Amino acid sequence: MATTDIRLSIAHQTRFAVRLASAISSPSHAKGSSGNAAFSPLSLHVALSLVAAGAAATRDQLAATLGAAEKGDAEGLHALAEQVVQVVLADASGAGGPRSFANVFVDSSLKLKPSFKDLVVGKYKGETQSVDFQTKAPEVAGQVNSWVEKITTGLIKEILPAGSVDSTTRLVLGNALYFKGSWTEKFDASKTKDEKFHLLDGSSVQTPFMSSTKKQYISSYDSLKVLKLPYQQGGDKRQFSMYILLPEAQDGLWNLANKLSTEPEFMEKHMPMQKVPVGQFKLPKFKISFGFEASDMLKGLGLQLPFSSEADLSEMVDSPAARSLYVSSVFHKSFVEVNEEGTEAAARTARVVTLRSLPVEPVKVDFVADHPFLFLIREDLTGVVLFVGHVFNPLVSA
């Protein structure tokens, strides 16, 4: 797959990410003024690309929703997944970074097609396991949850809720993403102090804020400010960063999320590209554990067929029963923690606003994240988005 095609596919993947982020951040899905959320669009993208690999007639709709460059271009999705797994998610860095895991749990009464199994193992670097859903569904659910707990080093202990699989379940496609990064410039914990954070309902809470007097990557606009916090690099070329998108208005998160979803190039146009001196610089510590069942949200994005009796997943298993297979649920859970050390998480046309004229004493930029904001973690060379979320109340962890 050509470099241009990969970049186009990544742009489509980013649009998928921000559309989901907008849906999760909308008032209808957010849980009041304390509904913090975090999810991995990349993890969902990889899992649904696996479904596309096993789909026949359903493939066009999956490819369109996931942002394939052309109609029904499942090969493009797999090429992107292969590039992402081998380049972005290869955890060869001593400084940490992401690790991705895929696993297909299939009932022992079915046999995976060799072509599908080869794709899982070859391009997605995943595994397949034969299990007994028909007589041991609760035990299999426990097995899946134990697998997730192990590969996320205990950050996520359960992905399948009680009763989510039963004797009619035939397949579980699992994908997990774990990320740990240390800031290039860590915050001094002795300077962390409780400050006021304003909630959407007009009230406020006291929460620990990190601060710094060092120059920061910040871009300023009329309606928002964007902060870039780079993570330490290892021995490779990958560059991971967290971005904090802070609307100017205390209740501006909804409008910001909508802009992200309707203007695919919005993020690239607002990237901070250079460091600026800071005046007040305060960022709250936060920890988010967020899980949701994603099928209704995906249906809202136009992905209907895989969840219906019209689903055609006949390229997944070698059996007459393949015609009756469909996706019943999509369970997703993420954990993100931001503190003085860095981040632990599981699950170019950019322009910078520069000073008109540089005075002898550079103008200092304030960045005080004391009201609801969006955040994302991405790999900067490729633009791949690993995690997206929003913070309504830093004191609420779940």
Curated annotation (Swiss-Prot):
Gene3D superfamilies named among the record's database cross-references: Alpha-1-antitrypsin, domain 1, Antithrombin, subunit I, domain 2
Chain ranges passing through the membrane: none
Keyword set, alphabetical order: Protease inhibitor, Serine protease inhibitor
Entries under SUPFAM superfamilies matching the protein: Serpins
GO cellular component, one term: extracellular space
GO molecular function (one): serine-type endopeptidase inhibitor activity
Extent of the signal sequence: none
CDD domains in UniProt: serpinP_plants (cd02043)
Site (Reactive bond): 356-357
Expression sites by tissue: Expressed in roots, coleoptiles, shoots, leaves, embryo and endosperm.
InterPro entries named in the record: Serpin_CS, Serpin_dom, Serpin_fam, Serpin_sf, Serpin_sf_1, Serpin_sf_2
Coiled-coil parts of chain: none
Keyword rRNA-binding: no
Chain residue ranges for the region called RCL: 342-366
Cited function: Inhibits chymotrypsin, cathepsin G and trypsin in vitro.
Domain notes: The reactive center loop (RCL) extends out from the body of the protein and directs binding to the target protease. The protease cleaves the serpin at the reactive site within the RCL, establishing a covalent linkage between the carboxyl group of the serpin reactive site and the serine hydroxyl of the protease. The resulting inactive serpin-protease complex is highly stable.
Family in the record: Belongs to the serpin family.
Protein's name in the database: Serpin-ZX
Source organism of the structure: Hordeum vulgare
